[in-house]
A protein has these predicted regions:
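Metal-cofactor-binding active-site regions of metalloenzymes
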Residues: 2, 44-46, 50, 54-120
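Divalent metal-dependent hydrolysis catalytic cores, especially in the metallo-beta-lactamase
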Residues: 6-15, 22-55, 69-85, 126-127, ...
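Divalent metal-binding pocket/active-site signature
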Residues: 16, 106-200
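Short acidic/histidine-rich active-site segments
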Residues: 167, 231-252
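Acidic (Asp/Glu)-rich catalytic clusters
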Residues: 2, 24-31, 61-76, 113-125, ...
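Active-site gating loops and adjacent loop-to-helix segments of metal-dependent hydrolytic enzymes
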Residues: 31, 37-51, 87-102, 124, ...
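Active-site beta-loop-alpha junctions enriched in small/polar residues
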Residues: 11-15, 40-42, 80-86, 133, ...
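Mid-to-C-terminal alpha-helical segments outside catalytic/metal-binding sites
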Residues: 6, 155, 258-288
Length: 288
């Protein structure tokens, strides 16, 4: 079977100091046609002002345009405050200035969301993300505040029908149910809520209506094949490629989604399912 349809990586980062355009070239040469480029902050010095967030986002948008112009790939862009950047700023500023530091961190988070919304309204960005909560143990205060701000962001997204890409903790029995409850409480359409770095059990009974974006390492294939027919709305595939010169190929390399797509087809997953993954679902979630 020769599949010549679209192939989309739903969560990939690019870095001007990394492979950048060469990574996009590798993706295309393997058969990739579309990318969802997710903003990645400079964790060593994340923005501290609204203007700083806008400038950082503008650079991600510029990289997306370079990829479009150079290779003709479809590129959708996701902008927002990475939970790790928020948590590290929060902890540093609270240590420096107590309650004032807390307020400053919350204000900066809101500025980052406002800046992302600006580019969504301008038609340059397609979703907000990756937003959510830390994937490592933190103090209860940090966890509770992260959830509070996540729900605030869900509320804003619900008002305008904007998709969210979520960065959350590793799998636990309550992860999907908790996210679903919070989103529904804020009026979100769960079909606009994407769980980045999702495990490969994509049954709707497991995902509670969220859209899973499966990190498609080799170990994910068997479970994905077992469960994909029970994914009511479908699923995405992603690499979470970091384009980090210090960690080449992490998390998965840019050639991975095209390779996994063909492996899934060879294993008996239908072309219709892959067409939904790579074309119909992205159009429904992000728009054309």
């Amino acid at each position: 079977m020769v599949y010549d349809g679209p192939i989309l990586d739903n969560h990939l980062h690019l870095n001007r100091r990394g492979l950048f355009l060469d990574a996009a070239r590798d993706f295309q040469r393997q058969g990739g046609t579309d990318l969802v480029l997710v903003h990645l902050p400079d964790f060593s010095a994340p923005p501290e002002t609204r203007a700083g967030h806008e400038a950082a986002y503008a650079d991600t948008l510029s990289m997306a345009q370079s990829v479009r112009e150079k290779f003709g790939l479809g590129v959708r862009v996701v902008l927002g405050p990475h939970p790790a950047a928020f948590v590290h700023q929060f902890e540093r500023w609270v240590n420096e200035d107590g309650e004032n530091g807390r307020d400053r961190a919350v204000e900066n988070y809101r500025h980052s969301i406002d800046a992302a919304l600006h580019f969504v309204h301008e038609g340059e960005a397609h979703a907000i993300g990756e937003v959510g909560r830390p994937h490592w143990p933190v103090a209860d205060e940090v966890w509770d505040l992260s959830n509070e701000l996540l729900e605030e962001t869900m509320h804003l997204a619900a008002q305008e029908g904007i998709p969210l890409q979520l960065h959350v903790e590793g799998e636990s029995a309550d992860t999907y149910p908790d996210l679903s409850r919070r989103a529904l409480r804020q009026g979100m359409d769960l079909r606009k809520l994407i769980r980045h770095y999702a495990p490969p059990d994509v049954r709707t009974s497991n995902t509670c209506g969220l859209i899973p974006s499966v990190l498609c390492g080799k170990g994910a294939l068997d479970r994905l094949i077992e469960t994909h027919e029970q994914a009511k709305h479908g699923f995405f595939l992603e690499t979470d490629y970091m384009d980090d010169p210090r960690r080449p190929g992490a998390v998965l390399g840019p050639k991975t989604v095209p390779k996994r797509t063909h492996q899934l087809l060879e294993a008996g997953v239908s072309e219709e399912v892959m067409w939904n993954t790579h074309h119909e679902l992205p159009a429904k979630v992000y728009g054309d």
